[in-house]
Regions:
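Aromatic-glycine hotspot motif
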Residues: 1-77, 81, 86-199
Length: 199
């Protein structure tokens, strides 16, 4: 997997990674499969109860959550719903931008209600469905993508923080968000397995 730390550290933007590493559409496909396969691997030894186990998370703070859920620890099902939605959003942006659609600013995002992912089978299904969707978005790229077409930033702060976002940069942004949640997913799993072992 590509090292996203230069972006998270504020040293580079996503478009810099694309340019400097000459990332191709096939690379984006490979990264997608690598991330999905990694997450599926994390689920190999979990059970249904682990998917809905609510971990303790002292850092939990989601200002976008519904009232009363801002400070809850995220279950494995919640995390999978969230990271797949963000990666699919990045892939959807990439399709629009690569095809030359102009004035792209509204977020093409849908997040599966996390409480619906309440079994291991549903978590696996959501991941495989997300793989299918992301790869399908990449298949919509034309032979000559419009790399000079950029997402319209809604705020100056967004533009300053993320930089210019063309098709590959938008895809990388969604994937980086997913990778950034790996440790949280592993910790939620660790707590779930520990709780089951002592039950």
């Amino acid at each position: 997997m590509i090292d996203f730390s230069p972006v998270s550290n504020g040293e580079k933007k996503y478009i810099d990674l694309w340019r400097e590493q000459a990332i191709t559409i096939d690379d984006l496909r490979d990264m997608t499969n690598e991330s999905i396969d990694y997450l599926l691997g994390l689920l190999e030894d979990v059970e249904d109860a682990d998917i809905i186990f609510e971990p303790t998370d002292p850092d939990a703070h989601d200002p976008h959550a519904v009232e009363g859920e801002e400070m809850i620890g995220w279950t494995l099902g919640h995390l999978i719903a969230h990271v797949t939605a963000s990666s699919e959003e990045g892939a959807a942006f990439s399709s629009l931008l690569a095809r030359g659609v102009e004035d792209v600013k509204n977020r093409p995002r849908y997040e599966t209600p996390w409480r619906e992912i309440d079994t291991k089978a549903k978590a696996i299904q959501r991941l495989e469905e997300s793989r299918q969707m992301r790869l399908a978005y990449l298949d919509t790229w034309p032979d000559q993508p419009h790399y000079e077409n950029y997402r319209v930033a809604k705020t100056e702060g967004f533009a300053e923080y993320f930089g210019a976002l063309n098709a590959p940069a938008s895809f990388l942004m969604g994937l980086a968000h997913e990778v950034g949640h790996y440790d949280q997913i592993k910790e939620a799993k660790r707590q779930a397995l520990a709780a089951r072992a002592t039950a």
